[in-house]
Structure formats: structure tokens, C-alpha cells
A protein has these predicted regions:
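Start-transfer (signal-anchor) and selected internal transmembrane alpha helices
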Residues: 1-55
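Transmembrane-helix motifs of polytopic, lipid-linked glycan transferases
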Residues: 21-31, 131-155, 182-183
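Membrane-water interface at transmembrane helix exits
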Residues: 32, 56, 115, 119, ...
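Intramembrane catalytic core of multi-pass membrane enzymes that act on lipidic substrates
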Residues: 41-132
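Aromatic- and kink-enriched transmembrane "portal" helix at the membrane-lumen/periplasm boundary
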Residues: 54, 125-130, 134, 141, ...
């Protein structure tokens, strides 16, 4: 659809980003004027996550499919994803979704072990696995928001991170793993404080 309807896709994308920035500005305003409290922020975060978990991650990136494929190499085929590429499993239906099937694992072993959680929770069903990975990203997002609050005790800091359109789109829509690294960094700061 996107390639054959570029104008519609562009308008939809630009409108979506504009809406994210409008809400971001509203939340920042409410935070600076102290017209929004912590409970309301976390309710809004939960609602945002609940809505965007249903968004299709390949709108902007195919990375989540690559995470699934790498996990499948390790946890389904029981092969070393640092040696064996997903493309070597000819006929695997997941290959139709990945755009980096010709690459070995790109991330550290700890990330691969973490991806075993959503992969195994998916019980071999592609759709369930995909949404398990998105839910995994959401948990790291909510955990990061919580840690920012615990570290800063500042509502505006929480808003600046949690409703940032880049964070929201890349985490809740695309399901990128950067949020896991953010969470772990924040967790280390939390332990130091």
C-alpha cells in the first residue's frame, strides 16, 4: 500500500508525527504548569502503550523481525546466531518479513538471552511472538519511565522522556531494542543513587 500510495502514506505519516508533537507540547505545558500529576501521567503512558502495541512495526522499521529471526536461530533451530544466519533456513516463513536475514546476530549475547523471553512466550506462533516482542519493548519503556521518576522525582523529566515522539515511535511502534539499553543504563544510575 505505502509504495503505491505515496501521497496518502506521506500525509498519514506527517499527520501522525504532527499529532505526536502536539500532544508532546501539551504534556510539557501541563507539566511545567503542574496541571498533571504522576497518576495521570502513568495512566496516559499505559493508554498510549495499549493503543500502540497494536500498531504494525514495519511501518518504519523491520528490525523487530530481525530480532525475532535471530531468536529463532538460537531458540528454535538451536544454532549459534553469531555463526548461522537466518537466511540459511531456507523455506522459513519468517524470512519474508526480515530485511537482514543475511546477517549474523548484531547484538551482545545478553540481548540474545533476553529475546528468549518473548520468543518462548510466543509458543511458536508468529503473531504471538511478534506481539510478545512489542510487549517486551513496552515493559522496558514503562520500566524506564518509572526509573526516571524514581531517580529525578520530577514530573517534567518524566514527561520529556516518556512522551518524546522519537521515544514513543521507535519504542512503542517499531519495537526497537534501544529501550532495553536505556532501561539498563537507568537501572544502573538508580542503583548508584
Amino acid at each position: 500500500f505505502a509504495f503505491s500510495n505515496r501521497l496518502s502514506t506521506t500525509i498519514f505519516y506527517a499527520s501522525s508525527v504532527l499529532i505526536f508533537f502536539i500532544f508532546y507540547g501539551i504534556f510539557i505545558y501541563l507539566g511545567t504548569k503542574k496541571k498533571i500529576n504522576l497518576k495521570e501521567i502513568f495512566i496516559l503512558l499505559g493508554m498510549t502503550a495499549a493503543i500502540l502495541v497494536l500498531s504494525y512495526p514495519a511501518i518504519l522499521s523491520y528490525d523487530i523481525f530481525n530480532y525475532v529471526a535471530t531468536s529463532k536461530v538460537l531458540f528454535f533451530y538451536h544454532e549459534n546466531p553469531y555463526v548461522i544466519m537466518p537466511i540459511e533456513f531456507i523455506g522459513d516463513p519468517l524470512l519474508a518479513f526480515t530485511h537482514a536475514a543475511n546477517k549474523i546476530a548484531l547484538y551482545a549475547p545478553f540481548w540474545l538471552l533476553l529475546t528468549g523471553i518473548p520468543y518462548l512466550l510466543g509458543l511458536g506462533n508468529f503473531i504471538v511472538i511478534l506481539f510478545s516482542f512489542k510487549l517486551f519493548s513496552i515493559l522496558f519503556y514503562l520500566g524506564s519511565a518509572f526509573l526516571i521518576w524514581k531517580i529525578s522525582r520530577n514530573v517534567l523529566s518524566l514527561i520529556l522522556f516518556s512522551f518524546n515522539p522519537l521515544i514513543v515511535i521507535e519504542t512503542l511502534v517499531s519495537g526497537h531494542n534501544d529501550i532495553a539499553m536505556i532501561f539498563l543504563a537507568l537501572f544502573s544510575f538508580f542503583l548508584l543513587s
